[in-house]
Amino acid sequence: MNMISYALLGVILGISGVIYAVYLAVWVLRQDPGNEKMRFISQAIATGARAYLFRQYRTLAVLLVILAVLILVAIDMPRRTFGLTALAFIVGALGSMLAGYLGMYVTTRSASRVAQAAATGGMGKALLVSWRAGAVMGLSLASIALLLISGFYLVFRSVLPDDWAVPLVALGFGASLVTLFMRVGGGIYTKAADLGADLVGKVEAGIPEDDPRNPGVIADNVGDNVGDVAGMAADVYESYIVTVTAAIFLAAILGLPTQFIEAIILFAALALVATFAGVNLLKTTGVKHPLSSISLAIYATIGLSVVLFFIGAFTLGLDSTKALALAATTSLGAVIAPLIVKITDYYTSYNYGPVRKIAEQAKISPATVIITGYGVGLMSAIPVIAVIVAVLGISYMIGYYTVPVSGFGELSKYLAGIFGTAMASVGLLVVAGIIITADSYGPVSDNAGGVVEMAGLPDEVREITDVLDSVGNTTKATTKGYAIASAALAALVLFIALIFEIVYSASKILGKGIVDMISESLSGLQLINANVLIGAFLGVALVYFFSSRTLEAVGRTAMEIVEEIRRQFREKPGILEWKEQPDYARVVDIATRRALGEFLIPGLAAIVLPLITGLLLGWNALAGLIMGAIVAGVPRALLMANAGGAWDNAKKYIEIQGLKKTEMHKAAVIGDTVGDPMKDTVGPSLNPLIKVLNTLSVVFTYVIVSTNIALGIWPSGLLPF
């Protein structure tokens, strides 16, 4: 097969995946939605989620149009790329929106169907419905990403034979930008609604979780979908697009044989084939422990992907050493996915020591719960970082000795190693379909439990949905670790791509050889260069600013929701006596309005700061900013996500021991409340932040380098070195 054939294969499989996702969606929606009350609850959740998403998309549309025009004028017109960079940016953004909407459309309508399946078909049927609802999201994500990458690659190679790589990366920039706002806005919504509903409902009014008398209960369930489904899907979709396009970009700019570009697209296509199989490998008959069935489906998918990588590598026409090296580095990335999931599980599941240690501290006070949980979160970052470092080192060495980079003098071997790390990153991301299937299953089962509670179904039905929900909490927590690790590797690959695009742009503008430009550029990137250090501190500061703004936004929004729920209880005392209907829509509207208002400032900071830094301080200050954001952002995201997950499950561990409404339980609830915005707002929002910084910089590199040269600050930056 030639290069065009592999890209066509990607297009065909991408379309096939979308069709299969639609088939699964139709199957799920044909299931019995239950009685009238169950349908009402499910419809209320779906309506609230759709209203939020559409209002968010309308808000984003203005920013996307402004940036598309800027890219057209500043990038496409000077480089004569026929507007394709702007087009890729818009399509990448629309793809992210579509992936989020498709998955959320099905998951919000699945809750009553899972609840009814639990009532009539037991554990097995309920598990199947919730799993297939999650698979709609997983398959949509992977298929749309593969379709866009393969399709745009075909178009760009045909229209722009010599300058097609940067427009392809713009696909990732569009996806990154939408994801950033979806993660921030969705995270603020979901945790503010959760906090508001719990603080007034459970703590003040003393009513159970998901009680229909709570005016915030629908907003809480809507938040599960806009944050945990649409947000997570957009996050991993973006990482997929960014990593694969950056790897293709590197292969092109390093002048590698076309088989290496073919390998990237081929491996992504083969992983999607494995995902088709994995989605159908879930055992549901006679199952008592759903987590084991889900884990088996994930392991089988990744194992099949690895086998297909090695088989596919030998169809590329490379010698056996290079084929094996490509398959090995990609497989290395794929096999660490379950390892990262397992590490996260160890630190966030109540089956292991760290969470039980937090639960034990609840016997003393909320303060010791928070202190111990924070310590667990700090420690949890270490093994994940160790795995990332090991993968980078091993894949670098494989690439160093096998990838045929030439024409860069003494740097050729070093650059070959860099491509090896890019392939490992590709391996981690192309198995995203099955990981997101497991993640999206979580909110579906969570909402199903809420429907059972609100509809007043029998206790035995609630027991089934509680088991499914417990497994869903585990899959949601562990997927956060995967998303953060994948974001880290994607950001590192993009960072290398950025440096080479800077060199390439300077070479074109100044008319110098690329080898000379590499040597000249690296002199401006030394760690003792003041510009680099200034940029690094700015990157760290951006991470902390971003974390602060999102945390405070949750608090402000939750405060308004709390006041509204209190007002309804005060003005309508019949609500608590089952005599009056709560105004669910009012709370949904508050959460929507405040979340959309709060996400603009941190989002705009992620766009404006790198552009100003690169244009005025110099390209090396921009490089320092990005590296500072990566080094500060990845451990902080792991801390936030895992500490929050550990606090959550410490509370659940106390509950399963029958210790609800004790002082010990109250202490654990406080820890869980503190951890909620950390694990579902701040931590997840840092993933797209570090990728937006990279993709934005790659797309605007030509403008940044041109400005640096015009201002006389190339290559050393504003401060002389």
From Swiss-Prot:
Q: Where are the transmembrane segments?
A: 8-28, 57-77, 82-102, 136-156, 168-188, 247-267, 294-314, 323-343, 374-394, 416-436, 483-503, 527-547, 599-619, 621-641, 698-718
Protein name according to UniProt: K(+)-insensitive pyrophosphate-energized proton pump
Which GO MF terms are attached to this record? diphosphate hydrolysis-driven proton transmembrane transporter activity; inorganic diphosphate phosphatase activity; magnesium ion binding
- Residue positions annotated to bind Mg(2+) 1 are D194, D198
* Site (Important for ion transport) residue list: R183, D228, D235, D680, K691
Give the membrane topology, semicolon-separated if more than one: Multi-pass membrane protein
| Predominant cellular place of this UniProt entry's protein | membrane
Q: Which residues bind Mg(2+) 2?
A: N221, D224, D446
Where, by residue number, does substrate bind?
K191, K679
HAMAP family assigned: PPase_energized_pump (MF_01129)
Quote the temperature dependence note: Optimum temperature is 80 degrees Celsius.
Ordered alphabetically, the record's keywords are: Calcium, Cell membrane, Hydrogen ion transport, Ion transport, Magnesium, Membrane, Metal-binding, Translocase, Transmembrane, Transmembrane helix, Transport
Q: Which GO terms describe its cellular component?
A: plasma membrane
Of which family is this protein a member?
Belongs to the H(+)-translocating pyrophosphatase (TC 3.A.10) family. K(+)-insensitive subfamily.
Gene expressing this chain? hppA
Per its database record, what is this protein's job?
Answer: Proton pump that utilizes the energy of pyrophosphate hydrolysis as the driving force for proton movement across the membrane. Generates a proton motive force.
- What highest taxon heads this organism's lineage? Archaea
Does this entry carry the keyword Protein biosynthesis?
no
Complex formation = Homodimer.
Which transformation does this protein catalyse, written as a reaction?
diphosphate + H2O + H(+)(in) = 2 phosphate + 2 H(+)(out)
Q: Which cofactors does this gene product need?
A: Mg(2+)
The answer on whether this UniProt entry bears the keyword Membrane reads: yes
